[in-house]
Amino acid sequence: DSKSAVQVLTPVIFKEDRSSYDIVKKVWKDSIVNEKNFERKWEKILHEGIYTKPLLSSQKVRTQNKISTAVLNKDQTLDDNKFEIIFTPSSSVYDGRYANNGWLQEIPKPITSLTWDNAAFVSMKVAKKLNIKNGQMIEISLGNASVKVPAWIVPGQNQKTITLELGYGREFSGRIGSGVGFNVYPLRTSSNMGYAMNADIKTLNETYPLASTQEHYGLEEDKLAAPGFSDLSTNEVQSRIPDLVKQSTLEKYKKHPEFVQDIVEEHKPDKSRSWADHSMYNPEPEYDYSKGHQWGMSIDLTSCTSCNACSIACQSENNIPVVGKQQVMNGREMHWIRIDNYFSGDPDNPEVSTQSVACVHCELAPCEQVCPVGATTHSTDGVNQMTYNRCLGTRYCANNCPYKVRKFNFYNYTRDLPEVVQMAMNPDVSMRFRGVMEKCTYCYQRVSEARIKADNENRDLVDGDIKVACAQSCPADAIKFGDINDPNSEVSKAKRRNRDYALLGQLGTSPRTTYLAKIRNQNPKLSSNNHQGAHH
């Protein structure tokens, strides 16, 4: 019979041996239920399994502003040519506790789209004044401490504030997290846990490569260069941003609820003529998409917070590999879902719009028309599917995809994975190999699982049987997935709303994934009316 540590130490402390029951009872009597009639209360606690402390009597409290006044009277003066430092936990690795997680290291951060590193966020005005470029090393000094960290120019950053992300630069984090990023904790003391005043900034004559996905897979026709707005307010950009992220204010939406249809004309293709008529192959039989289960998705841009939960859930569900910083810098990240960031208006106080983009499963998919081996085809239930062992890696499909959502395996990223890591992979999803194209599949393995379960139970599929990974993980419930032929499904209800629109609808691809336009409910005193220039 073994004994717990408490039972072993009890004879030493109390000079007598006690049972576990007596030890627990004594602790409750002395420390928790220090009341009269303990034996009766003890029996009640054992019977009910819960103990409710008696309510405290109400007390009159007089507020004293001594502490708050002392804080407010603390020296808050910001000297000229000095900066305020803001310490913030990383949106990816928090305070460093998740630094050894490759998924979180490689996920692009909101607004900056940085991966695998932290940086000092500076404003455009400061960057111009100090001649700072993205990735240029700067030295931040505060008191007797100083750190060297690369700079990153962020629209909307206060010109007197430098933001530093915590959680990086750990030396013993693990195989993935050790040595990633820069340790800024030396500047953070017990007296300035959240922010610090009067820091000095010194520009260094050295640079550090930062991996940002901001300019990857952009939907604009022109290659736009971050970080400034100086040359970005072109007619081309201004005309395309409202088409991609359709939005309005609540006040304008109430007056004109059909505003989505006025922004750009959506072309409805003539489905009586099939693209297969012009193919060198025998045309496949036409499918009647008005019958049977037809899968579709709706994404509400008003609800979406660009938190990246959908992208991480997709990576976990579909065995998407981590490729590393260098491959991200080469534009070869493998995420099936990306978050596009758009900035408009005043660079010092821009309006930020975000959009979650994955394969939209076009009914008339441009990718299917150019594949020489038929590796990407359409299913009878409206899903654009990939046959991996048929793919030759020509990448014609990626070139012809207007949404830029297809990802190519330049290497066999999973070949050298240890067996124990392979056991953590989803067995319902195929592992891809070098030379193969991949993309969102609408979590078809979950569709098949739900269909098999319904067949075994001798019933039809009902709305809610299928939860794709992105919709399941979305904390804002911004993603709806289901049968668009079911008028009572959540996705059908969403698509009937007057805010529904198709991304790049003017191309006539009939995407199954559509969006609900973003509605802003801004305080009129805080909103800006000058949101003309635009930048991705």
Segment roles from a protein language model:
Residues 1, 30-335:
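A cross-kingdom feature strongest in bacterial/archaeal respiratory oxidoreductases
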Residues 3-29:
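Non-catalytic, well-ordered alpha-helical segments in soluble enzyme domains
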Residues 310, 315-320, 359, 372, ...:
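Detector for the c-type heme attachment site
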Residues 313-324, 408-410, 478-489:
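Iron-sulfur (Fe-S) cluster-binding segments and ferredoxin-like electron-carrier domains
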Residues 435-536:
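Long, compositionally biased charged/polar accessory segments in the mid-to-C-terminal portions
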